């Protein structure tokens, strides 16, 4: 079935190509015929260009007096032949006389008048030129186009008569019957006079573009009545839209299915379950992201604000930060023993006084983190995030304190010396007491009892 449809489509496309090719050939042949007829007419009418320009000016009323005289002469001649009681012999003789006069004018008088100005016409281009009138080449082109169109119509009509004699007979009888009925209601003289008026007024209407002006004035009314081509097309478009809306919905196309693959649908129950997960639990999305080696910051949280959902309960980063608060220096000079002699000092002790404490604290935190990782197995995502957040926060604070202490080291040199003098005795006593204590066995304690008592006395 599909193969048959494909063959039909190929046959239709081939037929369309053959028709388009035949049309191109016909158009090319027609252009050649028009060019040949135009050249022939141009060779014959090139010497009559002033006369043709004058006739055009009279027909379009560029010369009103001559135009009025022409219309009067033609109307008089028409009604003379229409209302005369003369016989047909007189009319034929009068017509032959006019033909002989025209022949004498063309062959005898006109060549003598035109030979004197032959050199002038050759030197000039085309002589008289009017901006809104047609020149001889343009007249020849339109006349040739009309001649070729009529010739092709008659040739096609004869071909139609040869191939379909019955249809041609029916068509000819219908047309002649229409003319007979029209002639029965309207006299032939009136029809002939209307035809004469049409031939006289048609150039004037084209010259002033009467048809375009009438259409511009009638276009709004035609659009309101929806009889124009634009309104017809819009009405067809609206009908097509209504028809498409009335049709039942069909299955999605392949392109829509491909687009749906990039936009997966979410289940309402799964979304509600994800939203109801507590802080201690983790969704499948969090576990999958953790397995990929990245940190999941779901529900719009960050490691530093993950515990912001419950303000009454402190999170682990807050507890770890509060646990290290006693290590912070106090701004009270009495509590820290710093004499605030300089206003620029803020009472921050130098980290050089406690280098072992900072390294020891970092080492202990690292050991605690390693212990949690080793004992607790694979920790949860929340614990890892909280531990890393606390570790990074404390490291940043210690680095900030170290930088501040280095800047204020020169200003706080004298207060530190005084503080060392005040606490030197207490620190020495504390170190001495710490050195006096040793871990002894019970036997050593019993042996050293008399000496120890003597030393105490």
UniProtKB/Swiss-Prot annotation:
Chief place where the protein resides: endoplasmic reticulum
Pfam families: RHD_RETREG1-3
Chain intervals with Acidic residues compositional bias: 428-441
Entry superkingdom: Eukaryota
Keywords in alphabetical order: Autophagy, Endoplasmic reticulum, Membrane, Phosphoprotein, Transmembrane, Transmembrane helix
Keyword Endoplasmic reticulum: yes
Motif LIR motif in this chain: 435-440
Annotated stretches, region: Disordered: 1-24, 291-351, 410-457
Bridged cysteine pairs (disulfide): none
Compartment annotation: Endoplasmic reticulum membrane
Family: Belongs to the RETREG family.
Complexes and interactors: Interacts with ATG8 family modifier proteins.
Domain notes: The LIR motif interacts with ATG8 family proteins.
Protein name: Reticulophagy regulator 3
Source organism (scientific name): Xenopus tropicalis
């Amino acid at each position: 079935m599909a193969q048959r449809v494909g063959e039909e489509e190929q046959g239709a496309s081939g037929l369309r190509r053959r028709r388009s090719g035949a049309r191109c050939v016909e158009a090319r042949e027609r252009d050649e015929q028009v060019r040949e007829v135009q050249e022939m007419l141009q060779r014959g009418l090139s010497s009559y260009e002033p006369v043709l320009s004058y006739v055009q000016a009279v027909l379009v009323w560029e010369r009103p007096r001559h135009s009025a005289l022409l219309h009067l002469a033609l109307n008089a001649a028409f009604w003379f032949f229409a209302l005369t009681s003369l016989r047909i012999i007189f009319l034929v003789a009068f017509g032959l006389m006019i033909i002989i006069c025209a022949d004498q004018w063309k062959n005898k008088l006109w060549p003598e008048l035109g030979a004197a100005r032959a050199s002038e016409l050759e030197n000039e281009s085309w002589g008289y030129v009017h901006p809104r009138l047609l020149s001889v080449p343009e007249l020849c082109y339109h006349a040739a186009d009309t001649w070729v169109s009529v010739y092709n119509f008659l040739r096609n009509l004869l071909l139609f008569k040869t191939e379909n004699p019955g249809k041609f007979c029916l068509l000819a009888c219908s047309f002649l019957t229409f003319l007979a009925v029209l002639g029965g209601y309207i006299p032939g003289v009136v029809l002939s006079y209307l035809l004469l008026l049409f031939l006289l007024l048609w150039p004037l209407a084209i010259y002033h573009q009467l048809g375009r002006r009438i259409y511009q004035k009638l276009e709004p009314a035609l659009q309101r009545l929806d009889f124009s081509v634009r309104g017809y097309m819009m009405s067809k478009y609206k009908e097509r839209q209504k028809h498409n809306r009335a049709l039942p919905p069909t299955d999605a196309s392949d392109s829509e299915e491909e687009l749906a693959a990039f936009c997966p649908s979410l289940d309402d129950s799964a979304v509600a379950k994800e939203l109801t997960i507590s802080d201690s639990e983790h969704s499948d999305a969090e576990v999958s992201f953790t397995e990929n080696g990245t940190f999941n910051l779901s529900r719009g949280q960050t490691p530093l604000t993950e515990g912001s959902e419950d303000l009454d309960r402190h999170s682990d980063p807050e507890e770890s930060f509060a646990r290290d608060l006693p290590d912070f220096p106090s701004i009270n000079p009495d509590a820290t023993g710093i004499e605030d002699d300089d206003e620029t000092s803020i009472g921050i002790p130098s980290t050089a006084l406690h280098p072992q404490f900072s390294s020891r604290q970092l080492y202990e935190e690292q050991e605690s983190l390693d212990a949690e990782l080793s004992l607790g197995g694979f920790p949860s995502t929340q614990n890892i995030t909280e531990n890393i957040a606390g570790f990074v926060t404390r490291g940043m604070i210690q680095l900030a304190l170290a930088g501040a202490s280095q800047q204020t080291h020169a200003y706080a040199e004298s207060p530190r010396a005084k503080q060392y003098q005040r606490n030197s005795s207490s620190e020495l006593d504390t170190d001495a007491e710490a050195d006096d204590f040793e871990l002894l066995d019970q036997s050593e304690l019993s042996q050293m009892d008399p000496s120890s008592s003597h030393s105490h006395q």
